[in-house]
């Protein structure tokens, strides 16, 4: 088994991460027989999105096995290979979610931002993270938050992909409140704008989600996100007084603006922080607004698990998904 582990480790998965994802029943003695070793290789390949044949003793280095096309956007000097390991992890989680989701995908659902916003505002004063996750799920689009990645691996900010005939959205945002809402709207924008239709199993990986981007597909996804969250495809929050606001005043103003304009106050605060470069005040205002609210990661994780078909999913997949999501 040590040779297989070494190949997986050389591909970018540290041993502690490998151990975290092994199923409860795992036994090192599997490798003592040819059939057991073959089974172990197949199981490990499935966990880490690797080609099974590349884990054989006679093969060279382990190779990744993804379906569809990849479109990586990244900073200067950050190559596509920088995201390969994280993409493998995301594929594993997305595959499990797609194959075991309890709600059928509706390919005819209207995902134009005005239509989505209109539907959500019938039940809520503004577009919230739980409401948007629920709409995605009811359309048959699982939203997966991944917490755990291999040590030292570079993770993407978000990912939209076709998997097993349905779109899946993967999010990795670690900040507790507010940020994940725009990330989700942005990734839904890639789906709604048809950015995954380059192939039957298209993939769109966001190395970084920059709300200020205006060019090409990133600009389209941002315009969609702003439209969905605010009713305008571009939004810049500025103080009426022309002066920067203290955190308590910002929280109060964001709540008032949100109620008057049907915009989530957390999005108002973050928009203000970004456009005015006032991050300390914005982060403190978020704490005030969200002091008694569950964190975004728990919301997304809980809602996913609630909509997984527990009668369909096998124990190994449930254990793996739980380990990746950090549940």
Give the positions of each predicted feature.
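Active-site hotspot residues in diverse enzymes, especially metal/ion-binding acidic/histidine motifs
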Residues: 1-327
